[in-house]
Amino acid sequence: MNFEHNQKKPDNFHEDWKGQFKIFPWMAYISAIPHVIYIVTTLKEDGTPNAALEGWSSFTGESENFFVIMSGLIKTSHTYQNIKRNKEFCINFLSSDYLDNFKKSISENFDDIDEIKNSGFSSEQSLSINVPRIQESFLKLECEFEWEKELVPNSTNITLCGRVKYISADREFAMNKVTERFGKKSFVFHLMAMKNPYTGERISGGIGKIKLLKETEL
């Protein structure tokens, strides 16, 4: 029998950490929809590079217009404040070789440090914006701020859209066939922790990658 429920949080769903269900929707812990993760780089008010692990995003557009929509950006974060001030940011996709670097970008985000360097990455100059890119990234999207929207009035998070002004793709990644393009050296996915909907018990999450099932087109 399927688990069926309305939008009201189940009574047996208790927070694993303070503010959990203020920042994240409880349904996310049932749906467990995987999402690609990346490092977004921005510039702090004094021009020092900022780097932060992000996800909860989609990529869309038409013709010569390509956009990134970040839907879980915390309003109090350095990333959001920097984008609002400078109107620029860069999306940097990195492989699973850099999982430890990802963690460092979360745990060590002090105001007075170069977070790209501190996370173990190398900076390189972007070609359309002032924000630096991460050299180790196999796919970089240089973006300018387009718009933002609260999905819920007075929300903790903001949904933000950026227009991609310039793309930089690793030669091997860009030329590979689909059978070779996705794997250990490619996109990393966050498989978020879940909740047992019947007991409220926490189920551990993880990190994943794409496994090609069939070479075909839809």
Language-model region placement:
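Basic, polyanion-binding surface patches
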Residues: M1-L218
